[in-house]
């Protein structure tokens, strides 16, 4: 034994507690904390305790001992010992819980914790409502019922608060947990709200008298089961909510949709209305796509005078500064992609907004550029041919052609017609094109590469393919993509694409039966989210009614692959992954079909390819040819021709923030490093 170390320990007699009073040092408390933090991991409690010896001194604050133990755990994280992340997460959670208990005792309406140190749930709810964190409208159950539900469903699972790695704890605390919440509170409250909405969208009398227990002294078993089902899947991390739901649901007038795409008209009132709409959407937590195809080109006509229009660049500057000013509920920076078609006369100016050099006031460095190309452009590239750029204002007013609305053969015919009109003269009774440019298609592509080298964008949206594979191609045009390129459906000036997201977390879902169960619940929750969400604008509300777009995504695929010894590269492994996602799609369509039969189809169902029995833009023979499973696609195709609740159903989002909160790999992305550090503005 080291006698010097022993003598040093004997000199340390007191520690200072959080309230300032001295207490004799008790090493058993340090041991107990280390034992708890390392329990069930391959990390050593003794190693954690011994690393504190040089940090402890006489008169040290107990809070410092706790913080130092957490830092020691963080310092031990390595590719060979990743479970120190869990140890550090538990220690961080213990600190957070202690801080929140103190907040409860010192709030304007102080309340004590229970005998086990947990917050009294009824007083917790009242505190959250009083302090503006929760909307009281969500908590109409009697206090006794709320406590009964919590004690029955969530309280026995309080250990799940300690199932998060340190990066997940920090993400949850900095971005999503409100007031005195713990992860357990968060998932229970969300589950309660979803369950209440589930029954309120069905028979109201059943909801009030038989199911919810609002008018009874006993909660119905059906209601309890529904809350428990949602809570179990959320708290076991089998489903992952997007940032906007984690941060907004339980607040008044919450927008719960993540993705929006709007189209600018070519008039001042409409332009400024959409700018305001985008500000509201960003404030409410949405990521935005903005299509600029209809904006008249630089030097087009303005009030009848040719050469006076300023084009898309000044509008982009307005949008750029708007995203800096209006963030996403304080959780994220404002985020927008601006899309422009490759035939637009301003396309080169559009690209130069993110190139180095030039006028600073023409730069829009905080936007994400998106170029929209028809197949005709790619053909011009292949043959090293010319490419014509047009002003949308001129061709609409002279020829009645809205070029942005067209795709496929209709676009090709209109485009060829306009090229011929560039060769006409003023004597042509049909008119002629005055404002146009002729460039090499490859020169435009090279210009996009110059911008991409500087900024990483633009990304390309291939318009013909996007619209041709859409199940909604007869219901309107998809002019461009959303910010993260996973969600897009027909939209227009008066109908802003609006989509609600949620992901299944593959590494926590084992069997096919479990995958089906989780997927069905996920689609159910997505549908309830549309009902619960307060659409930020009227055009968003219209799109919800017409298409009812939701996006079921995936998370943690790399972790699931590793757990099942699968590689992204080997063909037979790819078949296994493909089968997994085919099942996911089948179960999602199956549940949406059932909800459509029960609650009604989305507004434009009759105009959609679902009505023809097509699934995700594919006919039955094509689906069966590509199938890697024995699922009954024949029966499902017949069913969807009669009912579908959602016009848009699946969307694999990047979900980097929410995957950090769960503690799994992002989306379907491979893991490229055993250990990495991600820094954000909030930690």
Language-model features: locations:
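Extended catalytic cores of very large enzyme megasubunits
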Residues: 1-683
């Amino acid at each position: 034994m080291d006698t010097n170390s022993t003598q040093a320990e004997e000199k340390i007699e007191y520690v200072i507690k959080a309230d300032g009073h001295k207490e004799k040092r008790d090493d058993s408390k340090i041991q107990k904390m280390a034992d708890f933090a390392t329990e069930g991991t391959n990390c050593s409690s003794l190693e954690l305790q011994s690393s504190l010896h040089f940090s402890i001194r006489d008169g040290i604050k107990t809070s410092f001992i706790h913080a130092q133990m957490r830092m020691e755990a963080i310092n031990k994280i390595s590719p060979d010992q990743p479970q120190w992340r869990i140890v550090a997460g538990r220690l961080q959670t213990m600190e957070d819980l202690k801080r929140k208990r103190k907040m409860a005792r010192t709030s304007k309406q102080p309340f004590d914790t229970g005998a086990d140190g947990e917050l009294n749930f009824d007083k917790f709810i009242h505190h959250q409502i009083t302090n503006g964190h929760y909307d009281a409208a969500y908590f109409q159950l009697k206090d006794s019922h709320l406590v009964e539900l919590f004690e029955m469903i969530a309280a026995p699972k309080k250990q799940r608060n300690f199932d998060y790695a340190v990066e997940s704890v920090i993400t949850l605390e900095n971005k999503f947990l409100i007031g005195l919440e713990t992860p357990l509170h968060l998932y229970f409250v969300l589950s309660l709200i979803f369950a209440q909405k589930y029954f309120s969208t069905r028979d109201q009398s059943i909801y009030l008298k038989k199911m919810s227990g609002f008018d009874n002294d006993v909660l119905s078993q059906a209601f309890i089961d529904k809350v428990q089902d949602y809570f179990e899947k959320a708290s076991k991390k089998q489903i992952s909510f997007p940032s906007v739901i984690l941060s907004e649901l339980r607040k008044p007038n919450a927008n719960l949709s993540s993705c929006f795409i709007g189209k600018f008209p070519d008039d001042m009132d409409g332009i400024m209305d959409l700018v305001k709409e985008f500000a509201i959407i960003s404030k409410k937590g949405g990521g935005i796509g903005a299509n600029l195809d209809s904006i008249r080109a630089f030097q087009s006509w303005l009030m009848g005078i040719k050469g006076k229009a300023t084009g898309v660049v000044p509008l982009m500057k307005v949008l750029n500064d708007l995203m800096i000013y209006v963030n996403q509920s304080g959780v994220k920076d404002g985020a927008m992609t601006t899309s422009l078609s490759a035939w637009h006369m301003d396309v080169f100016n559009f690209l130069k907004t993110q190139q180095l050099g030039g006028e600073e006031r023409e730069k829009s460095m905080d936007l994400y550029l998106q170029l929209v190309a028809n197949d005709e452009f790619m053909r011009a590239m292949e043959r090293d041919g010319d490419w014509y750029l047009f002003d949308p204002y001129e061709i609409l007013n002279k020829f009645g052609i809205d070029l942005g609305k067209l795709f496929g053969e209709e676009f090709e015919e209109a485009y060829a017609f306009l090229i011929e009109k560039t060769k006409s003269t003023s004597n042509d009774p049909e008119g002629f094109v005055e404002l146009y440019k002729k460039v090499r298609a490859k020169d435009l592509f090279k210009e996009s590469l110059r911008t991409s080298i500087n900024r990483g964008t633009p990304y390309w949206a291939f318009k013909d393919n996007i619209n041709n594979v859409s199940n909604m191609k007869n219901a309107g045009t998809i002019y461009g993509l959303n910010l993260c390129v996973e969600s897009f459906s027909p939209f227009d000036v008066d109908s802003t694409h609006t989509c609600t997201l949620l992901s299944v977390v593959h590494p926590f879902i084992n069997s096919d039966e479990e995958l089906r169960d989780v997927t069905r619940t996920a689609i159910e929750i997505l549908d309830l989210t549309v009902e619960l969400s307060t659409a930020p604008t009227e055009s968003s509300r219209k799109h919800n009614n017409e298409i009812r777009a939701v996006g079921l995504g995936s998370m943690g695929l790399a972790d699931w692959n590793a757990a099942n010894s699968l590689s992204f590269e080997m063909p037979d492994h790819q078949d296994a992954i493909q089968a997994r996602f085919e099942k996911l799609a089948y179960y999602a369509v199956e549940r949406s079909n059932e909800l459509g039969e029960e609650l009604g189809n989305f507004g434009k169902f009759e105009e959609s390819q679902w009505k023809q029995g097509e699934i995700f833009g594919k006919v039955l023979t094509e689906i069966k040819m590509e199938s890697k499973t024995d699922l009954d696609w024949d029966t499902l195709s017949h069913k969807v021709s009669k009912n579908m609740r959602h016009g848009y159903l699946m969307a694999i989002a990047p979900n980097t923030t929410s995957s950090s909160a769960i503690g799994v790999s992002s989306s379907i992305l491979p893991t490229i490093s055993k250990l990495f550090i991600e820094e954000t503005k909030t930690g």
